[in-house]
Design a protein with these regions (language model features):
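Extracellular polysaccharide-degrading/modifying enzymes targeting complex plant/algal/animal polysaccharides
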Residues: 1-106, 221-308, 313, 318-321, ...
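Short beta-strand/loop motifs in extracellular/secreted proteins, especially
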Residues: 6, 57-59, 155, 165-170, ...
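Residues within well-ordered beta-strands of beta-sheet-rich folds
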Residues: 9, 156-160, 199-201, 211-215, ...
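Residue-level signal for short segments within beta-strands and strand-turn junctions
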Residues: 63, 173-175, 331, 409
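Extracytoplasmic
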Residues: 91, 101-222
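Surface-exposed loop and edge beta-strand positions of immunoglobulin-like domains
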Residues: 146-148, 203, 272-274, 307, ...
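Glycine- and acidic/polar-rich repeat regions and solenoidal domains
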Residues: 269, 291-307, 323-376, 382-622
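A short, polar/charged loop-to-alpha-helix boundary motif
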Residues: 660
Length: 660
């Protein structure tokens, strides 16, 4: 009936729970209950997934609509102590264990490596982008950072690091033997060029200003380095030959009276084969799916997904609690799925090289109807609480429009690692429009556009509270346009691509730049026809009329392999090397800004001088000004190929015609 709420679930209500200890219950179900798919026997796996020394199952247990944490052992559910790790024979390798980019002691209280005044062992290294790292950190080394303000107390320690061997950071105040405030495990990772953040609550509260000492040690990584918070409730399952037993904590709730849901289905709405075109899914609540990891080299089932089809409309839905991906605009499956991590017998060893493998994925897509899929519309959905990504797609989302979605709390449990976690993660966003989305509290990134971002328009999005960056452009040749976005995380933009135009953005955090030797495809303009492969050099980037609220260094513009341009940008304070750009404005003092949530939405309070903003002329940005991307030789334009002109602001108000 009109106005009725319709909910589609991948879960079932389970009763028959038996109390086995204080606040611990169990239920045993015959395996026939699950049919051909038992999510408690199926582990999350796939290319570019790292399980972090334990298994992660596709099943889940829900109390009052929220999922419990999967424990790494039955002992953990009963809150028995973890087995002690035998370190009697452990000897440090002598290798560097990680390098540090910055510390964050409480929200927004950053300590930079430049602030280090004394150390034994590590070295300070200033990178091309003019940020300083602490490098060559080995077991037993230490570093001092003076006069750090703990104010009335800070609640967490967060570090940004490249992990090599892995180990621990002990934070002491007022001396190496002073009060131990935090011990942070900085785990291992398989991809050293990607920067990760690590966080731990403060073990002791201190106030006021103190000298901070970091002591570094190499150590074996414990079986489960990430645990749920103290209030987190856990579950654990064992699958035997004939039945499955689930133990869970319910926080004083009687599960037989309240009704407990458990995952039983791999998806909620997903076609059984490719090529099911022109489907509209509108106005549903869809949740609780036992999805698998959705990497770019495999079929990508989501809680709802299109599976290599054309012309879907997914709008006005509430989508939540997918074990991995919420909405997928993904590729078909074939014999080469996940071959980078799990090569089938007889496959070439070249598949172990991820770049080689994905280039072959693109080649196969071209002969499997890549030009006949995509053109989807994903709009006005509320997407939350998904383990991997809110919207995910490899190649199958070309020529699509993604607008007006609210995406938040993606990969927030962070029980595992990988390289596919974001609010929106697309490979091959060819001629896509991604606009007016609100994305926050997602790990690792808000929006991650990886490979084949060509003809893409990213416009009018609000992004904040992302640990690695609001937006990452990885190994693309462009052209792509990033315009009218508000990016407020500590790192706003990480540009690992050429051929980008950044226009009229409000940038609250840092800007990172990277280059790459990987050779990735270049396409014929406004098509999916591959014309060649090319590495990712520095440069061919345009920065017009942006407002930088934080420190940014423009010197690398003069050092790029390919020419880059900056003009008409406003720098909040402590900008560096603005002589490399035209018509730059540097404010006399840092702009004051605060993002706040209220009952009727999110609000940004920002104080800036209108006179300073109007003090220099700025150019109207258009296709004529932006020109063509060097490598793809494609004009900067709208996704449909029509000329681009930036004549309106984030709210849709017209720019001043003489000085935008």
């Amino acid at each position: 009936a009109p106005g009725e709420k319709v909910t589609l679930l991948g879960s079932e209500n389970i009763r028959g729970w038996q109390s086995v200890a204080s606040d611990i219950w169990k239920v045993t179900l015959p395996n026939t209950f699950f049919g051909d798919f038992n999510p408690y026997a199926e582990t999350i796996r796939g290319d570019w997934f790292t399980r972090v020394d334990r298994e992660h199952h596709r099943g889940a247990v829900y109390l009052e609509g929220e999922w419990l944490w999967e424990a790494h052992s039955l002992d953990a559910v009963f809150r028995r102590p973890d087995p002690v790790i035998d370190q009697t024979d452990f000897k440090p390798s002598g290798e560097p264990i990680f390098k540090l980019h910055y510390l964050e002691i409480g929200e927004g209280n950053f300590v930079r490596m430049d602030d280090c005044t004394a150390c034994e062992g590590p070295e300070l290294f200033k990178r091309e982008m003019r940020t300083t790292e602490l490098v060559n950190i080995r077991d037993g080394h230490w570093a001092k950072f003076p006069q750090v303000d703990f104010a009335a107390g800070r609640d967490f320690l967060r570090v940004c690091a490249n992990v090599l061997v892995g180990g621990y950071i002990d934070l002491h105040v007022d001396g190496l033997d002073g009060v131990a405030v935090a011990c942070l495990p900085v785990g291992t990772t398989e991809k050293r060029e990607i920067t990760s953040t690590f966080e731990v609550p403060m073990a002791e509260q201190v106030t006021g200003v103190h000298d901070v000492y970091l002591r570094f040690c190499e150590a074996p990584v414990p079986p489960c380095p990430i645990q749920p918070p103290a209030e987190g409730r856990m579950w654990f399952a064992e699958v035997a030959e004939h039945d499955t037993t689930i133990w869970a904590q319910f926080g004083g709730v009687d599960p037989n009276a309240d009704g407990i849901e458990i995952n039983v289905r791999p998806t909620v709405f997903y076609p059984s084969q490719p090529g099911i075109d022109y489907i509209t899914v509108r106005g549903f609540e869809m949740r609780n799916a036992a999805t698998n990891w959705a990497p770019p080299t495999a079929e990508q089932p989501g809680l709802i997904g299109t599976q290599w089809s054309r012309g879907w409309i997914i709008e006005n839905n509430v989508i939540s609690h997918s074990a991995c991906a919420g909405i997928t605009l993904g590729k078909y499956g074939d014999a080469f799925d996940n071959a980078t991590s799990y090569p089938a017998p007889g496959l070439s060893a070249d598949y172990l090289n991820g770049t080689w493998a994905f280039n072959r994925t693109v080649e196969r897509a071209a002969v499997n109807g890549w030009d006949r899929v995509g053109h989807h519309t994903v709009r006005n959905n509320h997407i939350m609480h998904c383990g991997q990504g809110g919207i995910v797609g490899s190649l199958g989302g070309v020529f699509s429009t993604i607008t007006g979605n609210h995406i938040h709390h993606i990969h927030y449990q962070r029980l595992y690692k990988g390289y596919e976690q974001a609010g929106i993660k697309l490979h091959g966003s060819v001629d896509c429009t991604i606009a007016h989305n609100h994305i926050h509290h997602c790990a690792l990134y808000g929006i991650w556009l990886d490979w084949l971002t060509q003809g893409t328009l990213l416009c009018g999005n609000l992004l904040h509270h992302h640990p690695d960056a609001d937006i990452l452009f990885e190994v693309n040749h462009g052209p792509f346009i990033c315009a009218n976005n508000i990016c407020l995380s500590s790192t706003a933009i990480h540009n690992w691509s050429s051929g980008g135009a950044f226009v009229h953005n409000l940038i609250g955090g840092r800007v990172r730049r990277s280059s790459d030797g990987r050779e990735t495809p270049v396409l014929k303009p406004h098509s999916v026809e591959v014309t060649g492969l090319h590495p990712i050099p520095n440069g061919d980037v345009r920065w017009y009329n942006n407002v930088f609220l934080s420190e940014v260094d423009m010197a690398p513009l003069n050092e790029h392999y390919l020419d880059s341009i900056a003009d008409g940008n406003v720098h909040g304070h402590t900008a560096h090397h603005t002589e490399h750009e035209g018509h730059a404005v540097v404010m006399d003092s840092p702009p004051q800004w605060h993002l706040r949530e209220a009952s009727d939405g999110w609000f940004l309070d920002l104080e800036m001088s209108p006179a300073a903003l109007a003090s220099v002329p700025r150019k109207a940005v258009s296709s004529a000004l932006l020109g063509r991307a060097v490598i793809s030789v494609q004009a900067f334009a709208q996704p449909d190929g029509t000329p681009f002109r930036m004549d309106r602001d984030y709210f849709g108000n017209a720019h001043e015609p003489g000085n935008p």
